[in-house]
């Protein structure tokens, strides 16, 4: 894929950068793999806002993506590459030799007509899924499981990947894009290559309305609120924050470490912020 800068024919298109979608399927998605997706607008079952700045936006169907890739030994042909409104990565529709169809995250470089295979005996080829114990050290991988059989949880967004650094006993060491080195069970599966649509990070939406289409509402700065609404609020005229940046509830907002999962601390060999002081 490539990017294109839009001509400044209006204020909204000035500075807009889009990803060229040539080669993507132009028709409707595969209906049997669609599910209804209800919008919560950031509210819980009591109607209370649990996530701010959400609401509105276009309605979407959820595309059921196969993150387990557990149909071993059966070759699957890539029928087409599709846009998925629910994620930054593109998805590929596979047709297995027995007639079943499944969506997967589309790896970089994959095209319609390619044949993919899952299982321990699969070749080391972009798009194939294998247990980590069968993948050579130094291979670039994505869609990595954290627990055997649970399905891919790591490196699923556009352009994401990880590198298999070492294997020792029951665990392998994987370096993520963030710099974090993590231990993964060698029976967990991973897909060869990296996720496609890597130009996604270069996209510029151009106008506020494009965020509203995505269900993202405006964010109001704390310094323009009243003291009752935010720790940064109040003052006569324009004032600064007068304290360290915090959330509306007083939690430090920039660089504050919030991880609190001691159960899995021993699985992290090197933290992602180890070079940040």
From Swiss-Prot:
Residues 37-60, 223-265 are annotated as: Disordered. Keywords: Ribonucleoprotein, Ribosomal protein, RNA-binding, rRNA-binding. GO terms for molecular function: rRNA binding; structural constituent of ribosome; transferase activity. Residues 229-244 have a biased composition (Basic and acidic residues). It comes from the Bacteria. It holds the Pfam family Ribosomal_L2. Residues 39-49 have a biased composition (Polar residues). The keyword Coiled coil does not apply. The keyword Amino-acid biosynthesis does not apply. Belongs to the universal ribosomal protein uL2 family. Part of the 50S ribosomal subunit. Forms a bridge to the 30S subunit in the 70S ribosome. This is Large ribosomal subunit protein uL2. It comes from Neisseria meningitidis serogroup C / serotype 2a (strain ATCC 700532 / DSM 15464 / FAM18). The lineage of its organism: Bacteria, Pseudomonadati, Pseudomonadota, Betaproteobacteria, Neisseriales. The gene is rplB.
